[in-house]
């Protein structure tokens, strides 16, 4: 990540909106924003393979559900945050991931400029590709600051997106069970 370019760009934005980039409260802002971007975009170029490849053998194939995984990310359209909760269900095929690995999977894909629909897809596909799940079902509910603080200005509006892979695509009863276990 080119922090010098980020700092220069932020300084130009400060000046472009009519502020003095050299006043006390803004002098360090370009450097702070560059450090923040290093942190919140740390998922760029990464996948969840390293997290989901560390799995444990299991003899049954009962559904695993982890819900209310908090995340925050940046909308790629306005570079404003959106945040919320991810709910994950999957059917193992002989192996299960450690529970923290599901949260880490959400984190990896949320640490980059993102849209909610793609975040859903990337998490579900990672469970299928790297864990070898028989099925994956991901629901994300989020509030988007681009809707809350600008434009339509409707704070508190939740957007829900879902994606189903494998067994969840074809088995409505399985999806319904996942919804119930997720409390949705």
From Swiss-Prot:
GO MF, one annotated term: GTP binding
Record keywords, A-Z: GTP-binding, Hydrolase, Metal-binding, Nucleotide-binding, One-carbon metabolism, Zinc
Residues annotated as binding Zn(2+): 75, 78, 146
GO CC list: cytoplasm
Matches recorded under InterPro entries: GTP-CH-I_C/QueF (IPR043133), GTP-CH-I_N (IPR043134), GTP_CycHdrlase_I (IPR001474), GTP_CycHdrlase_I_CS (IPR018234), GTP_CycHdrlase_I_dom (IPR020602)
Associated pathway: Cofactor biosynthesis; 7,8-dihydroneopterin triphosphate biosynthesis; 7,8-dihydroneopterin triphosphate from GTP: step 1/1
Record-linked Pfam families: GTP_cyclohydroI (PF01227)
Record-linked CDD domains: GTP_cyclohydro1
UniProt keyword Zinc, yes or no: yes
Group of enzyme by EC: hydrolase
Catalysed transformations (reactions): GTP + H2O = 7,8-dihydroneopterin 3'-triphosphate + formate + H(+)
EC number: 3.5.4.16
GO biological process: one-carbon metabolic process; tetrahydrobiopterin biosynthetic process; tetrahydrofolate biosynthetic process
Source domain of life: Bacteria
The protein's assembly and partners: Toroid-shaped homodecamer, composed of two pentamers of five dimers.
Family: Belongs to the GTP cyclohydrolase I family.
NCBIfam families: folE, PRK09347.1-2, PRK09347.1-3
Designated name of the protein: GTP cyclohydrolase 1
Source organism per UniProt: Streptococcus pneumoniae (strain ATCC BAA-255 / R6)
Gene this protein is translated from: folE
